[in-house]
Amino acid sequence: MAIHLYKTSTPSTRNGTVDSQVKSNPRNNLIYGQHRCGKGRNARGIITAGHRGGGHKRLYRKIDFRRTEKDIYGRIVTIEYDPNRNAYICLIHYGDGEKRYILHPRGALIGDTIVSGTEVPIKMGNALPLTDMPLGTAIHNIEITLGKGGQLARAAGAVAKLIAKEGKSATLKLPSGEVRLISKNCSATVGQVGNVGVNQKSLGRAGSKRWLGKRPVVRGVVMNPVDHPHGGGEGRAPIGRKKPTTPWGYPALGRRSRKRNKYSDNLILRRRSK
C-alpha cells in the first residue's frame, strides 16, 4: 500500500494520509444498492451497538467467497477499494468470459493468474480444499460449512495457519489465536489478505471518520447518571463502583460474550487469546 502524505496547507491535511494507488471503479453488473438500516439500533430503535450512524452511501460489491469457477484460470485486471470492508478487492477475468470480485491477496499484482480446484498449485490466490494443502500453509477466506463460502480470516491483513490434519478434520490456528477443527473438505485461499498497513493509515480529521459511519466515542464518566452508571458527581469523580460496567449495568471487562452450549464448542481446541 502506497501511503500519500498531503502538504500541510490546513490542519486537516497536516496529519491525513491516503492510499494513492487504489481507486474504485466498479462494474455495473457486480454491484447493487443496499439500504443500511439500523445504524446500531435494534427493531425497537434502541442502541445496541454504540458509535454508529451516518456515513456516505455505499454500493455493495458482489464478492465471490465460494470460488465456484473450478479449474478455469483467471487474470487479475484491477485492484479496487471497497467501502464495505477494510480489505481491497480485485476484479478477475476468467477464461470462459466470467468476471468476479475476490479479496485481494497480499502481494498479488495486476496481470497475475489464479485458479481454484482440487489439484491446483499451492500459489498465492489459488483456492483449494484443506486436504490438498501441506501443513504450515498460510490461508485466508476459509469455509466453515462445505459449499457455503469463506467466512473466516477475511479482514485486511488476516491470515490463518494449517497446523494439523487428522481423520476427517483439519486443525487451524486463526488470527485471533483460537485453535479449532474444520472439515478437511472445506476450501480456503492460499496467502494473506492484502492491505496489511490499514492500521497505519491516519484519517487526519473527524469528518473523515463520520464518512465511514462512525460517531464520536464519549466516556461514561463524563455523562449524567441518567445516561450511564459511571455518570454524575461534582467535577471529576470516580465511577463509584468496584468494576466498570456497560451503559446497561453489566460488567464491562472480562465478561464472556459467546453463547453457552453452542454446537461448535467441541470443535474449539483452544480459546482465542485475549
From Swiss-Prot:
Q: Which GO terms describe its biological process?
A: mitochondrial translation
Ranges of Polar residues composition bias in the record: 7-25
Superkingdom of the source species: Eukaryota
Principal subcellular localisation of the protein:
plastid
Q: Name one GO molecular function term.
A: rRNA binding
Compartments where located: Plastid, Chloroplast
| GO CC, alphabetical | chloroplast; mitochondrial large ribosomal subunit
Residue numbers spanned by region Disordered: 1-25, 224-274
Q: Which UniProt keywords apply?
A: Chloroplast, Plastid, Ribonucleoprotein, Ribosomal protein
Q: Which InterPro entries match?
A: NA-bd_OB-fold, Rib_uL2_dom2, Ribosomal_uL2, Ribosomal_uL2_bac/org-type, Ribosomal_uL2_C, Ribosomal_uL2_CS, Ribosomal_uL2_dom3, Ribosomal_uL2_RNA-bd_dom
Keyword Plastid (UniProt):
yes
Q: Please tell me whether the keyword Chaperone is annotated for this protein.
A: no
Family designation:
Belongs to the universal ribosomal protein uL2 family.
How is the quaternary structure described?
A: Part of the 50S ribosomal subunit.
Q: What is this protein called?
A: Large ribosomal subunit protein uL2cz
Native organism is: Coffea arabica (Arabian coffee)
Q: Which gene encodes it?
A: rpl2-A
